[in-house]
Regions:
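Conserved ABC transporter NBD signature motif
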Residues: 59-67, 74-75
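Short, charged/small-residue-rich alpha-helical element at the C-terminal edge
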Residues: 225-300
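Catalytic Walker B motif of ABC-type/P-loop ATPase nucleotide-binding domains
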Residues: 155-159
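Conserved ABC ATPase "signature" region
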Residues: 99, 110-126
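Conserved ABC ATPase signature
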Residues: 91, 130-137
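ABC ATPase "signature
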Residues: 213-214
């Protein structure tokens, strides 16, 4: 499928701070593409550039074949954008919000509005209530309805499940997959690693740069590591000794996680570091997506897989 988004050397600076740093991305049409990283990684700034809200400081970005710097007016009717704040008018009902957004796109047929409300699961009661009166999960679905009301070819979702409970998060991702199945390209930002694994491909971002890009399973495999989960007594000493030798060792409660080269015998490899403690359990597992993200941050080896 042809590319929905292509960037080359894309950069955005705010004074002396570089929020987006020479990004090269190629996102295929119809993909569910994740931008993953901690707060301050540059995800929201990148989305706002691709939506033609911010202009690049350098480099270029083409969205649906249009240059974001010179073709913003032609681009905006073709895309949808759901911000972290949900961008709804609190004093208006959901229906009034949808009608308002519909007018921005030259009017939306009543049938289309009904179909969208049905897609996101908005009830008649919810549609009639003011946004300020609604729980977060319903506001989230109303914001998605407003973003897709005009039938965009590409939709940007900026941390759409922030503050939403696990059930609401699961249902929302089912909606994302429905949109993708109909051919809509979805670009979503998140710092929740479990959500990132639902994407077709993800770009791992930190400090405005892309550290790696590819399918989640490929990125986990690209680390070339296994994870040893260790319980030892005394655990404080075990953690201190392992962390000194194996950077990236983490502690969760009293359980220690350490990344080792794939194919290694963890007991032999860790024997020296654990010689002064009693090892109660060593369990070896594949790296989680969170483990992979931490590994890429520490090693900063770019891995870029095409769409």
């Amino acid at each position: 499928m042809s590319s929905a988004v292509v960037t080359a050397g894309l950069t955005r600076r705010f004074g002396r701070r570089t929020a987006v740093d020479h990004l090269d991305l190629d996102i295929a049409g119809g993909e569910v593409f994740g931008l993953v990283g901690p707060n301050g990684a540059g995800k929201t700034t990148l989305i706002r550039i691709l939506c033609a809200i911010l202009r690049p400081s350098a480099g270029s970005a083409r969205v649906l074949g249009l240059d974001v710097a010179t073709d913003a007016a032609r681009l905006r009717p073709l895309i949808g954008y759901m911000s972290q704040a949900f961008s709804l008018y609190q004093a208006l009902t959901v229906t009034e919000n949808l009608r308002f957004y519909g007018t921005l796109y030259g009017g939306v047929p009543a049938r289309r509005e009904q179909d969208v409300c049905r897609l996101v699961g908005l009830t008649a009661d919810e549609l009639a209530r003011k946004v300020a009166e609604l729980p977060t999960g319903v506001r989230q679905r109303a914001a998605l309805a407003a973003a897709v009301l005009h039938g965009p070819q590409l939709i940007f979702l900026d941390e759409p499940t922030s503050g939403v409970d696990p059930a609401g998060r699961r249902d929302f991702w089912a909606l994302i997959r429905e949109l993708s199945a109909d051919g809509t390209t979805v670009i979503v930002t998140t710092h929740v690693m479990a959500e990132a694994e639902r994407c077709d491909r993800v770009a791992l971002m930190a400090e405005g740069r892309v550290l790696a890009c590819g399918p989640p399973a490929s990125l986990r495999a690209a680390t070339g590591t296994i994870v040893a989960v260790i319980e030892a007594d005394p655990w404080q000493r075990a953690y201190a000794e392992l962390a000194a030798r194996w950077p990236g060792t983490t502690l969760r409660g009293t359980t220690i996680r350490v990344s080792l080269p794939a194919g290694a015998d963890p007991r032999s490899l860790l024997a020296e570091s654990l010689s002064t403690v009693r090892v109660e359990r060593i369990h070896v597992t594949d790296p989680s997506f969170e483990d992979a993200f931490i590994w890429f941050i520490r090693h900063s080896h770019p891995v870029m897989e095409p769409p």
